[in-house]
């Protein structure tokens, strides 16, 4: 009987610590989701502003090219649809989000297009990406259970970003800017989706459907 009473304070302390860790985890998830939502909105606005500088025919042509082309970050294996996203583990979604954010650390520093909004926001974007990367890394450490059940393909090397647009034609500068902004918007939407699903799972909500 005495042993039971001795164990009770230990169990209570353990319970409080677990509850505190869960609350801190949710706080970090809230911050991460808010930051990527802001990045996604910025990406959407910059893309729309850039499209507004193009002629209608030019915009349609670039859109057709982009649909047939691919983003540098497409080398990162990620869920292909909502169903696969929902089936993915929290840890896998966090790792993919980390890789996607990491893939934009260098390109975000080279977004020097004629659009004054882009120039003004380039440093701010780099800082926000860096902060988000640190936050996701903390979430990964807090979610690890000692076993990473990720495929080898999830860790494949990204191609050098500097060579990604080297084969563009004479209108390469406009096309490069269009693809950079379109890919950035696309990837921020992906990360927002993955972090939102992961946050929902960690909060034990009944419905985490997209």
UniProtKB/Swiss-Prot annotation:
Disulfide bonds join 71-183, 200-208. InterPro entries: 4_helix_cytokine-like_core, Somatotropin, Somatotropin/Prolactin, Somatotropin_CS. It holds the Pfam family Hormone_1. CDD domains: somatotropin_like (cd10285). One of its GO terms (biological process) is magnesium ion homeostasis. GO terms for molecular function: growth hormone activity; growth hormone receptor binding; metal ion binding. Zn(2+) binds at residues 38, 192. Transmembrane segments: none annotated. Keywords: Disulfide bond, Hormone, Metal-binding, Secreted, Signal, Zinc. The keyword Secreted applies. It comes from the Eukaryota. The keyword Ribonucleoprotein does not apply. One of its GO terms (cellular component) is extracellular space. Its main location: secreted. It is found in: Secreted. Residues 1-22 form the signal peptide. Belongs to the somatotropin/prolactin family. Growth hormone plays an important role in growth control and is involved in the regulation of several anabolic processes. Implicated as an osmoregulatory substance important for seawater adaptation. This is Somatotropin. The lineage of its organism: Eukaryota, Metazoa, Chordata, Craniata, Vertebrata.
């Amino acid at each position: 009987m005495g042993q039971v009473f001795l164990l009770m304070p230990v169990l209570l302390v353990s319970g409080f610590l677990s509850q505190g860790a869960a609350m801190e985890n949710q706080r970090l998830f809230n911050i991460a989701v808010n930051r990527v939502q802001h990045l996604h909105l910025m990406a959407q606005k910059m893309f729309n502003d850039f499209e507004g500088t193009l002629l209608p025919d030019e915009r349609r042509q670039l859109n057709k090219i982009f649909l047939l082309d691919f983003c540098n970050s497409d080398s990162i294996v990620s869920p292909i649809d909502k169903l696969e996203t929902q089936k993915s583990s929290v840890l896998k979604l966090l790792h993919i989000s980390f890789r996607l954010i990491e893939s934009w650390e260098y390109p975000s520093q080279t977004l020097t297009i004629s659009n004054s909004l882009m120039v003004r926001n380039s440093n701010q974007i780099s800082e926000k990406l860096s902060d988000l990367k640190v936050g996701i890394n903390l979430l990964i450490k807090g979610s690890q259970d000692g076993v990473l059940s990720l495929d080898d393909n999830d860790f494949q090397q990204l191609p050098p970003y500097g060579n990604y647009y080297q084969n563009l034609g004479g209108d390469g500068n406009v096309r490069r800017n269009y693809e950079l902004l379109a890919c950035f918007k696309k990837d921020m939407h992906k990360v927002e989706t993955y972090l939102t699903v992961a946050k929902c799972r960690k909060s034990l909500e009944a419905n985490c459907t997209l």
